[in-house]
From Swiss-Prot:
Part of the 50S ribosomal subunit. The lineage of its organism: Bacteria, Pseudomonadati, Thermodesulfobacteriota, Desulfobulbia, Desulfobulbales. PROSITE patterns: RIBOSOMAL_L16_1, RIBOSOMAL_L16_2. The gene is rplP. It holds the Pfam family Ribosomal_L16. It comes from the Bacteria. This is Large ribosomal subunit protein uL16. Keywords: Ribonucleoprotein, Ribosomal protein, RNA-binding, rRNA-binding, tRNA-binding. It comes from Desulfotalea psychrophila (strain LSv54 / DSM 12343).
Length: 138
């Protein structure tokens, strides 16, 4: 699973997801991309599940770029624990996704294969997404 090698703080504030994505909203590497339409969090497991789906659909042809990284720790208290007594210990890592953020980019395959792979990957994610091409973004 994806996770940072070293972090400055073990636990972070929850934060609020407001506004659209400024960085990571334009095609940089591939010809086709999966774009988030609403805000949410992507766990490291969801990122990996969607990546595997894309690779299997493309039959290992072409190239895939992952444009998000889970850099925020998600904490959880143990089961059957009373409230209080501090914040729980870090359990997993999530990536904060805002509307307009590109999640995956694909190149080296035909258009119908790329669109099929990215749309199947969007089913693995907890928020709505759409497939964009270099032609539609210009």
């Amino acid at each position: 699973m994806l996770s940072p090698k070293k972090v400055k703080h073990r636990k972070v504030f929850k934060g609020r997801m407001r506004g659209a994505a400024h960085r990571g909203s334009s095609l940089a590497f591939g010809d086709y991309a999966l774009k988030a339409l609403s805000c949410g969090t992507m766990t490291a497991r969801q990122i990996e599940a969607a990546r595997i789906t894309i690779n299997r659909t493309m039959k290992r042809g072409g190239q895939v770029w992952i444009r998000v990284f889970p850099d925020k720790p998600l904490t959880k208290k143990p089961a059957e624990t009373r409230m209080g007594k501090g914040k729980g210990s870090p359990e997993s890592w999530v990536a904060i996704v805002k509307p307009g953020r590109l999640l995956y980019e694909v190149a080296g395959v035909s258009e119908d294969v790329a669109i099929k792979a990215l749309s199947l990957a969007s089913n693995k994610l907890p928020f709505p997404c759409k497939v964009v091409t270099r032609r539609t973004t210009l």
